[in-house]
Amino acid sequence: MFDVLMYLFETYIHSDADVMVEQNELTDELSRAGFDKDEIEKALNWLERLANLHDSEREVYVAASAQGSMRIYAPQELARLGTECRGFLLFLEQAQVLNAETREICIERLLELDKPDIELDDLKWVVMMVLFNVPGSENAYQQMEELVFDESDGVIH
């Protein structure tokens, strides 16, 4: 499923291609590209749920977060998000790339991936997908894009 998400993001989102594509047409294109129908369906459902997080009248993930508060991870989150991923999420929040709400959306989307262990690169791409989808997050998206594509500058401190 993650490979399908990456393909879609790189093909349609990151390349500024026409994003308005019929689902059947998209499914056919992905099948021709060699992706399994089940994986395609999972990826499209994942994206639909991401889009619905902002379109629905659901309660906000985090109503308020006190300055200096720390996110405590549940056991199932700890099992899938290693120290490196959790540290990077904290870094992104401290750098104001993520806020409490977008952090929670990222965690929820990461846990819905069909991967037992989530790697740092997976996290970076999911954060970009989330920020791309959140209205008003253009600057945060641009910062994240620089972090992902300008890794040759060295380690981030």
Curated annotation (Swiss-Prot):
Superkingdom of origin: Bacteria
Family note: Belongs to the Smg family.
What's the protein name?
Answer: Protein Smg homolog
Q: Please name the gene that encodes this protein.
A: smg
